[in-house]
C-alpha cells in the first residue's frame, strides 16, 4: 500500500498525520509513505525526525488586512495557489498513492484537491470542533471526512460523507496511571494543579495563574506544576514579586517545558490550559477536570469551539482570555478543588466524551475507502 499524507503549519496538523502513519505502519509494515508539507513549516523538522520521506510545495493563506502589504501578499498567494496545484499533481503522479490523507493546514488543500481530480481515493481528518477553512472547502470533494467530535458536522456541507473517529491519542497517555504518576513526581495527597500554555508560553495564562501559584507557595494548600514556556522566562521573577520564594516551596514545580506530560497529566486533579484539539483529547482520555482558556489568536476562533464542546458536556469550565484575572482563576480553581463531588462529575463526563480508539477507527475508515474491509 502507498499512502500520501498532507498537512502542516502547526503541530496540531502534523502530529495527527504522524500518528495515523505510525498506526498504519504498525498494521501493515510494508506500507510506503510520502508526506507533503509547506516549505518553512514545522513539518520540515518533525516529519524527517520521525523517519518519513517528504516533499514540499509552497502555499500561503490570504491576508485579510486591507493594506498595500496585504494586497502584495494576496497577489503572491494567488500565484502560489496555481503553482502549488501543479506541483501537487506532479508529486501525486510520481508517487502513485493508493490513498491521500489530509490533516489540515493550507498545504492539504492543493494536494487533496489534486488527488481527487486525478481519481485517487481521498480522506481528510478534522481535529477541531470548528473546522478550518481548508477542510471545509475539501469536504465535498473527498471520499470521507473524519471528525474528532460530532459537533463539527454542523459546520460542513451536508452532502459530505462523515465518520466520527476522534483524535489520535499517544499510547503513553492512554496507559498512564494516577498513583504511579504521583509516586514518580513525589507529590503527596494534596490536590495537584497542572497548568501550561504551550511550548512558547502564553503570557496571559502565565499572568493569570501567577496569583494561584504564589498563594500555594505561601500557604501550601495545593501542589502545582506549571510550564511557562520559551518566552516566559520572566515568570519566576513575577512569583518572587508576589512574595513566593520558589526555593522554599517544595510543593511547586515550575519549569520552562513539560517533557513528561503523560506523567504530569495523570497525576493532576485539575488542568488549566489552552483548548488545542490534541491537548483536549488527552484530557478527555484521562478524565481530567479542566479550566480552559482558549487562545483568541487562532483561525476561526476554533479553540473556543473546542472548549465549548467540553463545557456543554459538563466536562470542563471556561474562562475567555478577555475575562481572565488572577482572582477569577483562583475562585474557579478553589470552587472545583473544594468540591470532590463536582470534580468527580467533571472527570466522569470528560471520560464519557473521550474516544480512545481513534487510531483503530481511522484505520478502519481508510480500509473502507480502499475497499479492503
Task: Tell where the protein language model's regions lie, with residue ranges.
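Conserved nucleotide-sugar phosphate-binding/catalytic loop shared by glycosyltransferases and other
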Residues: 3-10, 27-78, 83, 230, ...
Amino acid at each position: 500500500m502507498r499512502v500520501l499524507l498532507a498537512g502542516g503549519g502547526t503541530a496540531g496538523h502534523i502530529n495527527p498525520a504522524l500518528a495515523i502513519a505510525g498506526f498504519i505502519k504498525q498494521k501493515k509494515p510494508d506500507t510506503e509513505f510520502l508526506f507533503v508539507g509547506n516549505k518553512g513549516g514545522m513539518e520540515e523538522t518533525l516529519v524527517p525526525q520521525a523517519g518519513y520521506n517528504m516533499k514540499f510545495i509552497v502555499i500561503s493563506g490570504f491576508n485579510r488586512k486591507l493594506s498595500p502589504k496585504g494586497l502584495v501578499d494576496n497577489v503572491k498567494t494567488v500565484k502560489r495557489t496555481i503553482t502549488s496545484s501543479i506541483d501537487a499533481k506532479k508529486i501525486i503522479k510520481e508517487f502513485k498513492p493508493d490513498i491521500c490523507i489530509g490533516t489540515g493546514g493550507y498545504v492539504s488543500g492543493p494536494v487533496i484537491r489534486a488527488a481527487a481530480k486525478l481519481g485517487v481515493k481521498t480522506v481528510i481528518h478534522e481535529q477541531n470542533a470548528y473546522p478550518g477553512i481548508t477542510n471545509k472547502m475539501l469536504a465535498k470533494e473527498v471520499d470521507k471526512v473524519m471528525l474528532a467530535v460530532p459537533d463539527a458536522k454542523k459546520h460542513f456541507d451536508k452532502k459530505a460523507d462523515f465518520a466520527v473517529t476522534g483524535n489520535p491519542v499517544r499510547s503513553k497517555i492512554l496507559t498512564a496511571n494516577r498513583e504511579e504518576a504521583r509516586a514518580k513526581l513525589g507529590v503527596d495527597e494534596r490536590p495537584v494543579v497542572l497548568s501550561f500554555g504551550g511550548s512558547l508560553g502564553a503570557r496571559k495564562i502565565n499572568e493569570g495563574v501567577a496569583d494561584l501559584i504564589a498563594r500555594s507557595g505561601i500557604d501550601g494548600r495545593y501542589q502545582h506544576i506549571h510550564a511557562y514556556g520559551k518566552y516566559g522566562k520572566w515568570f519566576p521573577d513575577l512569583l518572587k514579586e508576589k512574595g513566593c520564594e520558589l526555593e522554599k516551596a517544595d510543593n511547586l514545580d515550575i519549569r520552562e517545558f513539560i517533557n513528561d506530560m503523560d506523567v504530569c497529566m495523570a497525576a493532576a486533579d485539575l488542568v488549566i490550559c489552552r483548548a488545542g484539539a490534541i491537548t483536549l483529547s488527552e484530557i478527555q482520555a484521562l478524565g481530567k477536570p479542566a479550566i480552559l482558556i482558549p487562545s483568541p489568536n487562532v483561525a476561526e476562533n476554533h479553540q473556543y469551539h473546542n472548549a465549548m464542546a467540553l463545557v456543554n458536556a459538563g466536562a470542563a469550565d471556561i474562562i475567555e482570555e478577555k475575562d481572565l484575572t488572577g482572582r477569577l482563576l483562583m475562585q474557579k480553581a478553589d470552587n472545583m478543588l473544594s468540591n470532590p463531588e463536582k470534580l468527580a462529575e467533571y472527570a466522569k463526563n470528560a471520560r464519557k466524551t473521550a474516544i480512545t480508539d481513534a487510531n483503530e477507527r481511522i484505520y478502519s475508515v481508510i480500509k473502507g475507502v480502499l475497499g479492503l474491509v
